[in-house]
Amino acid sequence: MATKKAGGSTRNGRDSEAKRLGVKRFGGESVLAGSIIVRQRGTKFHAGSNVGMGKDHTLFATADGKVKFEVKGEKNRKYVSIVAE
């Protein structure tokens, strides 16, 4: 006979992989066209001048230059722009 009662099963023990979101190029950094600037879910940051947005809301540079973060507009939205050097 077993001297230990059988342990029950658990419904926990799973977690999703981290998605590596966040700012990839910070303000003042030089970037080349096509460089990813921000990986995000939704529009935490909006695309400014010389910045494009992918279908998953990733912001990327469309021209060479320096990254500039700014808050503007009535709703105080955060914009990311590329300023030509």
UniProtKB/Swiss-Prot annotation:
Signal peptide: none annotated. Coiled coil: none annotated. Residues 1-20 are annotated as: Disordered. It comes from the Bacteria. InterPro entries: Ribosomal_bL27 (IPR001684), Ribosomal_bL27_CS (IPR018261). Gene3D superfamilies: 2.40.50.100. GO terms for biological process: translation. One of its GO terms (cellular component) is cytosolic large ribosomal subunit. The keyword Ribosomal protein applies. Belongs to the bacterial ribosomal protein bL27 family. HAMAP family: Ribosomal_bL27 (MF_00539). This is Large ribosomal subunit protein bL27.
